[in-house]
């Protein structure tokens, strides 16, 4: 019999008062996260931002349904976060974008193309944005979800 674990908060796990059997054939959904990926880039609205460049901080979350790695312990059965970093770095440095929205969308599309993810969240932030006010950072988050292929609904005439 396997133990059921209950999540309390983001980082702690505890056993519930009663033990429950877990279906060993079930694959839980896994979130692969990369936080604090720092890449020097040349993105921005102003020509100066594009010429001089600046550091961007990325946060990524990939929702991996039916992740086999929970059973196999093989990196090829999940999302390799090293490869995630490579994809982000390439997308962020191969050309310049005026908006973080576009950059985040390009990164999310590439991650969805490469990995079998249900959804991808990409956040890019400028730790020192070119604004005349004291701010900790300015950032954008884009979420892409894989669409479900639906059969036309005859009742709706679609």
Q: How would you name each of these model-derived features?
A:
Residues 2-158:
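N-terminal, polar/charged subdomain of small-to-medium soluble alpha/beta proteins
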């Amino acid at each position: 019999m396997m133990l059921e674990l209950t999540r309390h908060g983001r980082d702690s796990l505890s056993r519930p008062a009663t033990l429950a059997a877990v279906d060993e054939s079930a694959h839980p959904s896994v979130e692969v996260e990369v936080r604090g990926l720092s890449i020097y880039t040349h993105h921005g609205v102003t020509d100066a931002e594009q010429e001089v460049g600046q550091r961007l901080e990325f946060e990524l979350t990939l929702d991996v349904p039916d992740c086999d790695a929970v059973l196999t312990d093989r990196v090829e059965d999940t999302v390799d976060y090293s490869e995630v970093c490579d994809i982000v770095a390439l997308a962020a440095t191969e050309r310049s974008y005026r908006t973080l929205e576009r950059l985040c969308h390009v990164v999310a599309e590439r991650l969805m193309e490469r990995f079998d993810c249900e959804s991808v969240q990409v956040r890019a932030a400028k730790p020192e944005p070119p604004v005349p006010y004291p701010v900790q950072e300015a950032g954008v988050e884009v979420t892409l979800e894989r669409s479900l292929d639906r059969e036309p609904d005859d009742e709706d005439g679609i």
